[in-house]
Each structure stands twice: as structure tokens, then as C-alpha cells.
């Protein structure tokens, strides 16, 4: 698997050239297939069954490649709650699962189901659906030339990231918390602030756990690797965020990230970028710390939160 990753043209900033140069955005044949699958979401209502996709052998092969890479990476870099959830709802190794197959595994565990999306979903619909146990997930597969990184969510991201989360009742309750919060918001600005909290926790969160990881390295006291878990003998934070769990490359470089202790007030003031590796991560001390921090901050989160915290719109690089 290392030879595949070594050929992946990721820049120091985490981009695969410019966004337009990524094969997932420049290969016309791939885009035709990707867009045909995405169009299945047109007119789809939350909670309706997702139509079945007849995946090609090439798409199944991409799935197998990523599954083989992530299985070991999760054992080395993922937190215990993630590993336990993955055992509760095993991910098939040999084929891309249909949404119905995923939902059948998840619903008895924590009450969640996949509902169809064609790509990025606006905040109100995406976050709000979580209150009722629905997670918007896509069905297309990332480009086969870059199987270990994708600049947009694909079915691999949704299953290996959010699908694992939603097999855990504790993580699933955090999704519902975001859903309840989103439902009481009216302004796009407030929803955007809420999406930042979601992004840096359930998408890109890490947490400190005692013990060591196979193959992990200790972060330095300055520069990359600073923050919780840094210093000689300290265990680096472990990943729980869905975007990290579905990206082999980002898992392998956790010790090179700037890691800051989780402070939700700081998180909500931090813009994020959708494509490219994240330069800054926020680390909870444990799952209880994450849960308490989110519950406390979101309890009175409303449309005036930005004004109360004196937050100004910060342009985010979401390309």
C-alpha cells in the first residue's frame, strides 16, 4: 500500500495540485460516472430508500484498496470508541455496500440510517436531519488513481467515517445534538458557525487516550505535533473524526499536525477548508470531555451566539 501512497501527488499544504487538477475533478469519464450516480439524489426526500447502484469492478477494486489501507491505519491511529464501533458493525472488505446494507447494520445499534445525497448538502438540511436519525450520504466512489485521498465526500468517506460513528450510541447522540441545535436556528450565519463546530469535532476531531499506538511517534514541543499529547513519552492524540478515519494519508501524518486543546469557543471562531489536509486539529481529553464540551456549548447556541461572542465573518478556504 505504501507504493500507492508514495505516488499520490499531495503538496505540503495537503492539496493535490489545484482543485481543478485532481483527477476526480478533471477526468471526464470519471465525472460522467460520478455525476450519473449523484443525479439519483434529485428529488430524493429524507428517509426514502436510496436506489441501488450497480457498482463496477473498478469501483469495488478501489474500495478493496482503501479497506486494506484503513484497516491497519485504524488499529494504529483511531481511538478506542471508534475501534469498538467498527467491531459492532463490520465494514465489508470485498465490495462497496449499498445504503440499505449499511442502514440495516446501523439502525439496531444506534437508530441511524443513511439518506441519499448527491454531494455537499446545505447546512440546514444536512445537520437538521440528524435530529431524527438520518445522515446524508453519497453513493459515488472516489477516483481510482488517488484511492487514499478524496477532495470531496464519497461513499468510502461516509461508510468508513460516519458509518463507524453511527454504530456507536455515544457518537450517534452527538449527531442528534447537532441536529437539535440546527433545527432551532434560523440564520445562515448561525448555521455556518455551527458547521465549524461540527467540522472540527465529528469530521476532524482527535482525542488523547492513555497507552501507545503501534507505529506512532511522539510529537515535538514546538511546531508540528504541539499541543495535547506532545512531549517526550506522551501518546499522540488518536483520531475519531470521520474525515480522518476515511483518509489514510491524514491518519499517517497526525504527528505532523498542529494540535490544540479542544476549546469550543476557539473552534467556532476558526474557519475551515473542505479540500486539502487540515493544518490545525483540536483534541479532546476523552469522549466524556468531548461530550460535555459540546453539550455545554450547544445548550444555548442560537442565532445571536455570533454577536454574543463578537465573532466576525472570517473568509474560509472551502475550495
Residue ranges and their predicted role:
Residues 1-163, 279-319:
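The feature captures two recurrent sequence modes
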